[in-house]
From Swiss-Prot:
It comes from Neurospora crassa (strain ATCC 24698 / 74-OR23-1A / CBS 708.71 / DSM 1257 / FGSC 987). Belongs to the ubiquitin-conjugating enzyme family. This is Ubiquitin-conjugating enzyme E2 2. The keyword DNA damage applies. Pathway: Protein modification; protein ubiquitination. InterPro entries: Ub_conjugating_enzyme (IPR050113), UBQ-conjugat_E2_core (IPR000608), UBQ-conjugating_AS (IPR023313), UBQ-conjugating_enzyme/RWD (IPR016135). SMART domains: UBCc. Catalyzes the covalent attachment of ubiquitin to other proteins. Plays a role in transcription regulation by catalyzing the monoubiquitination of histone H2B to form H2BK123ub1. H2BK123ub1 gives a specific tag for epigenetic transcriptional activation and is also a prerequisite for H3K4me and H3K79me formation. Also involved in postreplication repair of UV-damaged DNA, in N-end rule-dependent protein degradation and in sporulation. One of its GO terms (biological process) is protein polyubiquitination. GO terms for cellular component: chromosome, telomeric region; cytoplasm; HULC complex; MUB1-RAD6-UBR2 ubiquitin ligase complex; nucleus; Rad6-Rad18 complex; RAD6-UBR2 ubiquitin ligase complex; UBR1-RAD6 ubiquitin ligase complex. GO terms for molecular function: ATP binding; proteasome binding; single-stranded DNA binding; single-stranded DNA helicase activity; ubiquitin conjugating enzyme activity.
Amino acid sequence: MSTAARRRLMRDFKRMQTDPPAGVSASPVPDNVMTWNAVIIGPADTPFEDGTFRLVMHFEEQYPNKPPSVKFISEMFHPNVYATGELCLDILQNRWSPTYDVAAVLTSIQSLLNDPNTGSPANVEASNLYKDNRKEYHKRVRETVEKSWED
């Protein structure tokens, strides 16, 4: 069945293949274009450097008018990531625009890794360490980077 959402997701997939953003990749799971597996590589010169973080993206038939739900599968220690792996990111909620595609969502998440919003923490411990004890925060992040290699 070809719906507007599915057609748009196939365009997003084609863009990911022909013009992939640096450090992110994503593709639909076999036989279901509405669910995607994604990987974000931790940005260079950040505590997340060399991490390989896996995510899953779920799209509803209202996409692109409704944002996808995005969840880290890899363990993540970050002020804007809940223990469940779900993200607190404005473009996935109140600042969503149908102009965003899969590449834009993933690059926004990649940017968020080193530029957290501590004013709206999903992980209070990570937020407090980020603000008050950056050395310990970096240590905890590096632990998740090392775990990401085992996924």
